[in-house]
């Protein structure tokens, strides 16, 4: 989707806030651990290239979801190590090797397909993925891990790392977390040899399970200033949200009592009402679920009325405002604030999803 620079709807990204959040984490974790930020999904909607360049001096490497995300960083001269967390097709391992991109090896079957490729494998770096209870990708027993190590050694593949991912580190009940921890430790104890990087700590584990001492801390949502648990667990230190979402009023009118607003005529005025139109809609990631939620105009909460359209939405105003008046969808205006987590709670989802759904059509402004 093409960015719309001539449309005054913007995501404002505070790169200093992201740097400050990383600095706070560096003080919180083990001094020997490297932070590898997750900049997948366009850095959770913040802009992967811009974020990576802004924090490169603070981190050991970066984590992305797929090979294309890694290639994008390399194409923009990001030189730090990069780990692809998802599996890739074996036919593309030569690209990763040539660009010094480390890959997740999710299974022995996958690695067998890799060595069948007519590619130079001596520059290939792999991190064996361990499924300790997430049920997503990775091996589940030490025998398979050791067979993978043996196969990697045979073909001069660099067994650089091994890792797992916790499913419930952001929950108050740590029963599942401890079970996963025990499963991962059991596999580690039976490995034929240890790699350079052993890592299992995601953002939530770094925040609430400091007993985990890892070579790499995979820092995600809290780097961008959000609590991975939503509002369930209290953060051990303050972090600053890095993204605000703003737009403006493009049309204002007073309509009579009994008039309807939007598709389906789902909102009817009970009295004369000022209605403002805002250029953002579900094609921008501001979903139809937002009907009935609030935005901020001049520091005051204003209700979203009628169904959110593809490109625009309507809000109920307390009075007339000039065209171009700022509308805050996420962020602070005077004494009031709307957080990403507030939006997520209204939608019945998580703050991660709210950020990741903000489409490329919304221009990003960096400060």
Curated annotation (Swiss-Prot):
Active site located where? Answer: 40, 263
Q: Which domain of life is it from?
A: Bacteria
Enzyme class, top EC level, equals isomerase
Task: Give the coiled coil ranges.
Answer: none
Q: Which Pfam families match?
A: Ala_racemase_C, Ala_racemase_N
The reply to whether Amino-acid biosynthesis figures as a keyword in the UniProt entry is no
Alphabetically ordered keywords of this record: Isomerase, Pyridoxal phosphate
Q: Which GO terms describe its biological process?
A: D-alanine biosynthetic process; peptidoglycan biosynthetic process
What cofactor is needed?
Answer: pyridoxal 5'-phosphate
Q: Which residues carry this modification: N6-(pyridoxal phosphate)lysine?
A: 40
Q: Which EC numbers does the record give?
A: 5.1.1.1
Protein's name in the database? Alanine racemase
Could you tell me which species this protein originates from?
Lactococcus lactis subsp. lactis (strain IL1403) (Streptococcus lactis)
Taxonomic path: Bacteria, Bacillati, Bacillota, Bacilli, Lactobacillales
